[in-house]
Amino acid sequence: MEKAIEIRECTALDELAECVQIQREVFALPEAELSPVRHFVVTKNAGGFVIGAYDGDRLAGFVLSVPAFLRGERAFYSHMTGVRQEYQSYGIGAKLKWAQRTRALDDGVKYIKWTFEPVKAKNAYFNLEKLGAIVCEYQPNFYGTDYATADNKIGLASDRLFAEWHLESSKVNALAAGEKYIETGEPTAAIEIMSDWLSMVKSNPAEALEEQKRIRSEFEAAFGDGLIGRGFRRDAERPAFLLYQNNDVHF
């Protein structure tokens, strides 16, 4: 049964404090790495915003948007999106992102950017196929190597892809309207990733380290050739990012 979720901005201090608590529950981060209430307050007063998903009075999830620039224009940096575990099968993450888009467009902003882990297929599919974001930048070890994080005892680098959400692209407009978007051309290249990254990290850490290096190398080569990732192939065995020539992108 679908929950009756209300999407609205978080403005009160107790609401922002609940965003900090959701970070504790959702992200495998040390306490010192959590964004505190004052970070949310400063962001809001600097022109950013926090959108929350409410199940009655209970905050089920949130998305934090920080003022930024992209391609020489005003943008928002989507610093984090968190949804409590018991609400993660209700499409709340998507509701938050589409509300974020609406809010940005109301502010006259056409771009939102954020980072995500290139090794996680579920996130990649959501970002590129459900939201219509593109990727054209890879940052090795973006946050540094943190051996203290719960799922990173082997010392994996914090590699990240930068997602660019062009809020009025033909693909994003179609997806926002609930329509299916079909690419007109064939991808120039594909970069395969593993179907279950966390299982590989636990069962074969050495292989996980080598896979991360391979994926990094392939993305750096593809972006160096001017390719842009704007699709993702879901496959139980061989999921893959789909990369196209830059001039095929519909901004």
Predicted region positions:
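A conserved beta-strand-loop-helix scaffold within acyl/acetyltransferase catalytic domains
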Residues: 5-85, 230-235, 245-247
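A conserved beta-turn-beta hairpin within the catalytic core of GNAT-like acetyltransferases
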Residues: 68-78, 88, 110, 186-191
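Residue-level recognition of the GNAT/N-acetyltransferase active site
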Residues: 84-86, 117, 194
